[in-house]
Amino acid sequence: LFNFYAGASNNGEANYNTLNIELKHPLEIANNFLGYNQHSFYGGFATKGANHNTINIKNDLTTTDLSQSYKDALNIVAARTLEGSADYNKVYINNSMSTLPVYIYTAKKNILNNQDFYPSSANNNKVSIKDFASFRNLTVLTEAKEASYNTINYNNVQSITDASNIDKGSKIIIRALDKANHNTIDIKNYSSNAADNAYLIMAYNEAAYNKIIINDTLLGVASDKREGILSIIAGLSNNGHDNTLIINNLNLDEYKNNNSIFIAPSAITGLSEAKSYNNTLYRWEFNIFKNTFIDILAGALVHYEDNYSASNAITPSDISLSKNNRLI
């Protein structure tokens, strides 16, 4: 187990730190007394704010040995703070690979003494990943009370999940308690065969002016059952408006299960006082396995969730609820 810190404060801020990782020898995957392998890289680790921190990663992160523990993880955390802002943090990964599950955070929720602590803001953060392969799952996550003007870019990225691997899904999620506005997820030359593929920008009160762009991407499921879930939603909120989803050459492999594929620029979390308007899906090319069906492809959908299950449906044609949502 290794933890690397560019800057840390137990009672204050961690700002303007840089962590450069260019390993000459990758980290070894070993059978140890703990029964799992877990390593973490931190740009800024603090309690009252973490801003302007950068993590640069080049070369392979691990050896090619595969480990199978559900606790395995390689955590890349640009900013960790219990309160205050987590703004202008960056993660760059180039020409690298990992056989551990990779979790990348520009800002993250922290749990202490059964309490959740969120940064007050996660704004203007960036993740750029190029020429990278994860032989387990790959997840990029931003969590804060407010998240705006964040960008996540993939170019030539693979999330290769073997059917025998313990898999938690491959996801890109920007999640805010209040508002998530003006965020961009741009995916190019990407493939994932995780059981749970989720690409979401979401907030409770407002998700607006967000954009997801998908080019030359292959999504499927590695398991023998060919059962999984795929969700692509640019603005999931009680108030979702002016969000854009652009899809050019999306290839969908076999999904045998029902209620598996949901694609929309906007989604609302129920019908009570929710609104979805001025959202647009631009669709140029889909290539779909012959037995695969897209459950919902729409300008907006409704997401229902309780303690037992979750489901989705097309938003009803009610001008007070949904208007000017377009599928082009």
Residues of each region from the PLM?
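Surface-exposed loop/turn motifs in large extracellular/passenger domains
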Residues: 1-3, 8-40, 44-328
